[in-house]
Design a protein with these regions (language model features):
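Short catalytic/ligand-gating loop segments at beta-alpha or beta-beta junctions
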Residues: 1, 85-88, 152, 180-185
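Short amphipathic alpha-helices in soluble, non-transmembrane regions
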Residues: 127-136
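Predominant activation on well-ordered alpha-helical scaffold segments within soluble catalytic domains
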Residues: 40-41, 63-74, 133, 169, ...
Length: 239
């Protein structure tokens, strides 16, 4: 597939978040797919010690150092929201000590974790990456530990095609389906858009988010989203 032989890519997907439920709307038209900055294999290394024998000043607690890093990044996330970047997100999906070594009476000597930032602004994502390195260095010096953040990977924010979004808006008005426009998370559409193929999406309202057993969707909402996609696809095919 290439721009030479592919007119457009249209994708239908559940929202995976709470916005459409809160707004009581069946569907949305995404404006941009969030980019991300990720540290998938980060570690903090300290020194294992007896919890009752080592005073605070003599500890090299890898877990407390990691928790401080996470807390300070969370504070930075709040600052960014206050500055007008509500589309920025921050998640620590993994944080754990070594099960073979950890104990209630042992100072943690190692902690593994992940950091995942998302957003619609490359400048903001770059700022988050740079600040992560700076904070890790500050905490390293203060707590006498070492951070090995590992590879930093990610992708830039990907705007979706304006012309296709216009068609979807027109279809929503013609069908009487109320929609909003909003950013979305990583989807197949971003791959096509980065390859130069016009891409757009329709998000369908769903209950209880995603990535959990309570995830749900009303078939009526699925039908509304499918109508938007079908009408737009047929118009493109007839050109």
């Amino acid at each position: 597939m290439s721009p030479a032989n592919t007119k457009a890519f249209l994708e239908l997907h559940i929202e995976q978040g709470p916005v459409l439920v809160a707004r009581d709307l069946p569907a949305a038209i995404p404006t941009v797919i969030r980019g991300n900055v990720r540290f998938p294999y980060a570690r903090c290394l300290g020194e294992y010690a007896h919890s009752a024998a080592v005073p605070r000043g003599g500890r090299k607690d890898a877990l407390l150092a990691t928790v401080e890093l996470v807390a300070r990044l969370d504070a930075l996330w709040q600052e960014l929201e206050a500055e007008g970047h509500p589309d920025t997100v921050f998640t620590v999906g993994k944080l754990y000590t070594d099960a073979a070594e950890h104990a209630m009476t042992k100072v943690p000597g190692a902690c593994c974790f992940t950091l995942n930032f998302g957003g619609t602004s490359k400048d903001v994502l770059d700022r988050l990456r740079d600040r992560t390195y700076a904070l890790a260095d500050e905490i390293r010096a203060a707590r006498n530990v070492t951070f090995a953040l590992g590879d930093c990977v990610g992708s830039d924010p990907t705007p979706l095609d304006d012309g296709l979004r216009d068609r979807l808006r027109t279809a929503s008005q013609a069908l009487g389906i109320p929609v909003i426009e909003m950013p979305t998370v990583g989807h197949d559409a971003s791959i096509f858009a980065r390859a130069g193929i016009p891409a757009a999406m329709v998000l369908v309202r769903n209950q209880h988010g995603s990535h959990n057993a309570a995830e749900a969707m009303e078939m009526a909402d699925f039908g509304e989203g499918a109508k938007l996609l079908a009408v737009t696809a047929l118009e493109l095919a007839e050109q």
